Amino acid sequence: MAIHKIKIFSGRGSEYLAEKIAASFGTTLGQSEVLRFSDGEFQPCFNESIRGCTVFIIQSTFPPSDNLMELLMMIDAARRASAYKVVAVIPYFGWARQDRKDRPRVPIGAKLVANLLMAAGVDRVMTMDLHADQIQGFFDVPVDALYASGIFVPYIKSLNIEDLSIAAPDMGGAKRANTYAKHLSAPIIISHKERAKANVVGKMTAIGDVKGRNLSLIHISEPTRRRGIS
């Protein structure tokens, strides 16, 4: 069976993390650059041959949208340079909160991003802690949805925190927080949000006993603080 050489590249949105990943893999990042033009456009370029290679491109797609566009263009460039496989490693999957129509006449941003990645020619996607697990179903290519709990649970255990509770920032994060709570044998606190409008929380209620507890994960709300968190 043919073995295809692996090469790791980074977009400008994840350079530090990409260097750490490459070092852990026992290699260095591949040579690439992004050319800037006077009208504001940019053009990624691979500065070494990737023909027949399995190419990993590490790039988060958080705003600004240039990060997403840069990733799409790098995937396209790798395809046109005859890479064997192109794997997009997306530590932070932007637009993941837009996983459904929560009101009339709005897009489903996460599905659109999935379509764009597939149209660019990606063969596989790897990402961390998706906002909604169902986003994996938006793709027609394999998606490796990884979880940070494998790293953070041992770390939190090593701190030997007394009276520990695990907090979820909202109902959507309850499943993830529950995973931590089970591994850490700790009770869970959930925040229930009622939004007045986009990005504005009109009311937040902490569900669970937080008085005198040490909370871990993820956002500690003001209502939670007022109820006696230490």
Q: Which residue stretches match the model-derived regions?
A:
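Positively charged, low-complexity intrinsically disordered leader regions
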Residues: 2-27, 32-41, 47
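Residues at the starts of beta-strands that form the adenosine-phosphate
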Residues: 5, 54, 84-87, 123-124, ...
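Residue-level signature of catalytic and energy-coupling elements of molecular machines
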Residues: 21, 88, 129, 170
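Short, glycine/charge-rich flexible loops or terminal/linker lids adjacent to PRPP-binding catalytic cores
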Residues: 30, 34-49, 96-102, 106, ...
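Active-site-flanking structural segment that lines cofactor/substrate pockets
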Residues: 32-72
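Glycine-rich anion/phosphate-binding loops
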Residues: 60-79, 102-115
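Anion-binding alpha/beta catalytic cores of soluble intermediary-metabolism enzymes, centered on
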Residues: 103-163, 198
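Single conserved hydrophobic/aromatic residue that forms the stacking wall/gate
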Residues: 218-230
